[in-house]
């Protein structure tokens, strides 16, 4: 019976992705059988402290009982988290900035849709590949907003932001070495007035953080599709504000290329508006989401965590 695969009843672990110190984009991971790498009834139950695997009767009907016990958060060291955050941010900044540079160099061959798709896909693949390790913040505004709402420990905020800034600068200088002297195409500068640029960056950062908070901290949101949902939001925001502000939404998307190109025009807009928008967006979702004690909706949902 140890090696027989038996489907389990869906459940919600007590350790949610929003728990301080736990990955923000993560899911259930039980222990696997050492011989074939498959989940077995006993390996699943052993990960839960509220079941005794000595009672074989619990498995005789061919299904596992509902699992409602607490699951310990993954034991990931801070160094691994920072490494994953650095690599993830590096990929994001390199992809988004490189597409903008190539678009300028080729007289618009990438098009606005291409730039939006590049950034959105980069966000999606990084969340899917590193979210279970570091939470895949990739953005100081996201880190600060999560910390403000107690979804992330404040003591880790400086080192997370440090990793993000280092990744941004590294990506920018790598691109400068490749594309010099066309590095200016990757710098986010507004083509509208400063007040309009600030408003647009605030709004699109609000949009982004509202969605991120939903999929990362609410177990009733479509957590398995977090990468797709956040990537699609980034694409939408670039289509909205790309021609006007370059749609930064991220202080390090602006900071690294600005340093590499020595172009700090209107940089204060891109360092302040995304953080304020993220704080308000995260707070707004926290206010409007269903209370934890509410009953689940009676109608069936297409996706569940």
Swiss-Prot record:
PANTHER family: AQUAPORIN NIP2-1, AQUAPORIN NIP6-1. Belongs to the MIP/aquaporin (TC 1.A.8) family. NIP (TC 1.A.8.12) subfamily. Transports glycerol, urea and formamide, in Xenopus laevis oocytes. Very low water transport activity. Residues 7-23 have a biased composition (Low complexity). Keywords: Membrane, Phosphoprotein, Repeat, Transmembrane, Transmembrane helix, Transport. This is Aquaporin NIP6-1. It is found in: Membrane. The lineage of its organism: Eukaryota, Viridiplantae, Streptophyta, Embryophyta, Tracheophyta. The gene is NIP6-1. GO terms for cellular component: plasma membrane. The chain crosses the membrane at residues 82-102, 111-131, 159-179, 194-214, 221-241, 267-287.
